[in-house]
Amino acid sequence: MKKRMLSFVLALALCLTLLPTALAAGNASFSGGSGTAEDPYQISTAEDMFALAEAVNQDKVSYEGSYFRLTKDIDLGNIHWTPIGNNASREGRQFLGSFDGGGYTISGLEVDVDSGYVGLFGVVGLSVRDSGAEVKNLRVEGKVSAARTSSF
């Protein structure tokens, strides 16, 4: 009985410890919207773009089935950019949502990485068949360079 109670308490403690992390992962802040096709997340600032990149790359939120819409031109200010989705071999580090640029432009993109995952988006729907992942109606201006090295 004591072992069963201890197991229960430890399991509860683990769940309570992980709960804030799980809640924070899905709470990236955007300029509006709920992420549905009818009410997509609104991306209108460089901060929104950085929040999306951080959620996918750090919090491992893929946004599968979620919708985004760019609402105006954005200048990323030539600040070093880490592509949205940066490692296809790790679950959750790829973008699986739908990003509609609305015909707007994201300028000032500057990417300089040591991998093959380069651009505004590094990995979009690579490992999930029929995920619906897409990036459309978007113009991107900036500089992208990649130095892929091998130890073979």
What is the meaning of each model-derived region?
Residues L23-F152:
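Surface-exposed repetitive/solenoidal architectures
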Residues A11-T17, T21:
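Bacterial N-terminal signal peptides
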Residues M1-L10:
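Positively charged n-region of N-terminal signal peptides that target proteins for export
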